[in-house]
Design a protein with these regions (language model features):
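Conserved loop-alpha-helix segment in the C-terminal half of the alpha/beta-hydrolase fold
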Residues: 195-231
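Active-site loop/oxyanion-hole signature of alpha/beta-hydrolase fold enzymes
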Residues: 2, 9, 32, 44-81
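Conserved HGGG/HGGXW glycine-rich cap/lid loop of the alpha/beta-hydrolase fold
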Residues: 7-55
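The conserved beta1-alpha1 loop
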Residues: 18-22, 82, 202
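Flexible "cap/lid" loop of the alpha/beta hydrolase fold
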Residues: 94, 99-133
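Catalytic histidine-centered segment of alpha/beta-hydrolase-like enzymes
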Residues: 230-239, 243
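Conserved alpha/beta-hydrolase catalytic His-Asp/Glu region
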Residues: 131-186
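Gly/Ala-rich beta-loop-alpha elbow adjacent to hydrolase catalytic centers
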Residues: 81, 85, 89
Length: 250
């Protein structure tokens, strides 16, 4: 099996971090944080099934992604995860708590409003691609990337856009998988095992982490909450603060 979809950063003997991207994303997105802020850390950042260079085949479920991730972990890791990836991380911690040292959940998307998810999925099907890079850039700026460093946005466009047979551009992901995954985010909120230290970062300008979600996590004995003044792309918009949070559990 090719491992072109597994992005690795840092020294082979560094403390291990498994970094999980969000829906429509890709593993290389973690490169700026890993190389620029956590150079001594060994970061393993896979493209999740249906994204980037990973397998596009179903089943498109949290459980299948967990099964995909387990072989990457030869020892327990700190799992740093964004949005959809954070939901995956929680399921990983429940399935294999022996492999998770701590969780850092960046604006997690879990137990979301089904109406919201239906509308997002419909919008994605209605607009699967763009006329050109400029249109893709505008879409990113209108959907949570406005407070991200422009250089990171340009790197995202260069890495993650691919051409379509019709001469347009689209993200390097599989629309059937991504559309299906929006439904996974409507599944009930579940919590990690109580013994695992869990840090939740809520993005103040994002709608995903509700007071009810925070209240549920606050029942955990080893829970820490942070709120950053940013939109949904936490690691890209607030890299220094994100680094501090990761270091707190390393």
């Amino acid at each position: 099996v090719s491992d072109a979809h597994i992005h690795r950063f840092g020294p082979a003997d560094g403390p291990l971090v498994l970094a999980l991207h969000g829906l429509t994303g890709h593993g290389r997105r973690w490169g700026a944080l890993a190389d620029g802020h956590l150079p001594e850390v060994r970061v393993v950042a896979p493209d999740l099934r249906g994204h980037g260079r990973a397998s596009s085949l179903p089943p498109w479920t949290f459980e299948q992604i967990v099964d995909d991730l387990v072989p990457l972990l030869t020892e327990p890791a700190v799992v740093v995860a964004h949005s959809f990836g954070a939901a995956v991380a929680i399921h990983l911690s429940r399935h294999r708590p022996d492999l998770v040292r701590a969780l850092v959940l960046l604006d997690p998307a879990i137990g979301l409003d089904p109406v919201l998810l239906h509308d997002i999925a419909e919008a994605g099907l209605a607009r699967p691609d763009y006329a050109d890079i400029a249109e893709a850039r505008r879409d990113k700026l209108e959907t949570a990337w406005a407070d991200v460093d422009p250089g990171l946005l340009e790197a995202e466009l260069a890495e993650h856009l691919v051409g379509t047979p019709e001469g347009r551009v689209t993200w390097r992901m599989r629309l059937p998988a991504v559309t299906s995954y929006w439904g996974q985010l409507a599944r009930e909120l579940v919590l990690p095992p109580p013994r695992i230290p869990t840090v939740l970062v809520r993005a103040g300008k994002s709608p995903f982490v509700t007071p009810a979600t925070v209240a549920a996590f606050a029942t955990l004995p080893h829970f820490t909450l942070h709120e950053f003044d940013c939109d949904h792309m936490v690691a890209q918009a607030r890299p220094a603060e994100t680094t501090d949070v990761v270091r707190s559990v390393l």
